[in-house]
Amino acid sequence: MIIDGKALASDIEAEVRERVERLGFNPGLATILVGENPASQMYIRIKHAACERVGIRSENIVLPGDTDESTLIKTIQGLNKRGDVHAILLQLPLPGHLDPRKAMMAISPEKDADGFHPENMGALLLGAERLVPCTPRGIVYALEHLGVDIEGSEAVIVGHSNVVGKPLAAMLLNRNATVQVCHVYTRNLKEHTKDAEILVVAAGVPRLIKADMVRDGAYVFDVGINKVDGKTVGDVDFDAVKEKAAGITPVPGGVGPLTVAMLLSQTVTAAEMSLERQRS
């Protein structure tokens, strides 16, 4: 089975529209883009188009590529103070002279659309999933939507980034999976992946995972986005692995749409949290 990320994202968007209607106002998302990275510009356009579909107000703040750290942090602090901005997203990567960790920590935890703030990451490790990284949230949503029994399952994640691997491991542990986290330095990677019932690959290595590394009937989520001979491919050898997997996400059209849809969901969550604070 091909796991259709676009179809699942459409379901999430429908849920988000209903939540916006119940709120009674349009939540606000502010994105910050530093420089003119073409890929980042494309991702920003995709996110803002998605906001428009579900009734989220969005604005994009573009700063020059030579913006200094002080200016970036002041821009973030200004958005933190605005009542009409419920969620803030800092588009990565930043230019090399800027420290993404300092910038992320400047975002108010209550407005952290990406779920990268240490306070939100810490809450996740303690089992409280309020604002969490969007890609892991999308993967867990897909597993639950497909009726996969996460509890007690053998889950292997290839990739240990703060964006995908580490937070996803915490989310799966919160659901009582048995989780292994591997990476490109793991020795004998096949020995770890071949028994996985849930396999998530976010290593940034084109077609790293071959068919003989995958268990029959596994659910495989390919987070990789790589360019090979002018084509976009994932970290999984899709054509070979799809013959063995119970479900597999394609690249493109798999995890990417889920990630964007979860950004919308988290923006509404941030607005709901803001409303609760006002009422308490």
Curated annotation (Swiss-Prot):
Q: Which reaction does it catalyse?
A: (6R)-5,10-methylene-5,6,7,8-tetrahydrofolate + NADP(+) = (6R)-5,10-methenyltetrahydrofolate + NADPH; (6R)-5,10-methenyltetrahydrofolate + H2O = (6R)-10-formyltetrahydrofolate + H(+)
Q: Name one GO biological process term.
A: L-histidine biosynthetic process
Q: Which GO terms describe its molecular function?
A: methenyltetrahydrofolate cyclohydrolase activity; methylenetetrahydrofolate dehydrogenase (NADP+) activity
Does the record's keyword annotation contain Amino-acid biosynthesis?
A: yes
Q: What is its EC number?
A: 1.5.1.5, 3.5.4.9
Checking Gene3D superfamilies in the record gives: Leucine Dehydrogenase, chain A, domain 1, NAD(P)-binding Rossmann-like Domain
Query: From which residue to which does the signal peptide run?
Result: none
According to UniProt, this protein's pathway is:
One-carbon metabolism; tetrahydrofolate interconversion
What are the record's GO terms for cellular component? cytosol
Residues annotated for NADP(+) binding in this entry: 159-161, 225
SS bond partners: none
The protein's job, in short, is:
Catalyzes the oxidation of 5,10-methylenetetrahydrofolate to 5,10-methenyltetrahydrofolate and then the hydrolysis of 5,10-methenyltetrahydrofolate to 10-formyltetrahydrofolate.
Share what the entry says about its subunit structure, partners included: Homodimer.
- Protein family according to the UniProt entry: Belongs to the tetrahydrofolate dehydrogenase/cyclohydrolase family.
- What this protein is called in its record is Bifunctional protein FolD
Per the UniProt entry, what species is this protein from, by scientific name?
Answer: Methanothrix thermoacetophila (strain DSM 6194 / JCM 14653 / NBRC 101360 / PT)
Taxonomic lineage per UniProt? Archaea, Methanobacteriati, Methanobacteriota, Stenosarchaea group, Methanomicrobia
- Gene behind this chain? folD
